[in-house]
């Protein structure tokens, strides 16, 4: 018989096709993202989705329009930027050029994201906020500059890279940095 669930780091049973808030745990998200390499592992050295997420939560603070938001809105958008790839902790990442041909995967990913949003009391629509997207794209440009080899063909149009440079973390450090940032932003486990 085929299994319809996976066991998480914390020992929970996670059902990707029917997730519930009880199945979601920030430590599982941090653990999964800390161990998941960006770019299908094709970067020059291991660089986790967890570290990418932490950096996106910082980069968003540098974007035009961020400071015009209220303090509560700024904190919340930083938390959203931190969690924007959280479903990948449970269902891994599928490269964008493939994902666009997998409508069922996109539906599963959306359902997992909705459940994560509900778990952490976040409006699901905020995951589509333009500043969150811009932070993600700024990280893409920065990662391209710092972590990828010479390009064989032009990439998509991207904003300017972030001014700082990326120094990849080991998975355990990425996990702990994610958890620390979650707490710093007022996330409630």
Predicted regions: what they are:
Residues 1-189:
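Metal-dependent phosphohydrolase cores
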């Amino acid at each position: 018989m085929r299994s319809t669930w996976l066991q998480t780091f914390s020992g929970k049973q996670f059902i990707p096709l029917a997730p519930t808030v009880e199945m979601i745990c920030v430590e599982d998200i941090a653990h999964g993202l800390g161990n998941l390499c960006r770019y299908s592992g094709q970067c020059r050295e291991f660089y986790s989705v967890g570290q990418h997420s932490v950096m996106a939560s910082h980069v968003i603070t540098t974007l035009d329009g961020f400071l015009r938001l209220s303090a509560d809105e700024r904190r919340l958008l930083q938390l959203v930027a931190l969690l924007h790839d959280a479903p990948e902790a449970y269902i891994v990442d599928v490269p964008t050029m493939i994902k666009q041909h997998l409508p069922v995967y996109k539906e599963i990913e959306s359902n997992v994201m909705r459940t994560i949003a509900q778990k952490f009391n976040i409006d699901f629509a905020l995951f589509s906020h333009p500043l969150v997207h811009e932070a993600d794209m700024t990280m893409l440009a920065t990662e391209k500059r710092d972590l990828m080899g010479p390009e064989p063909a032009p990439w998509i149009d991207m904003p300017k890279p972030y001014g700082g440079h990326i120094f990849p973390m080991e998975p355990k450090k990425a996990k702990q940095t994610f958890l620390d940032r979650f707490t710093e932003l007022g996330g409630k486990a």
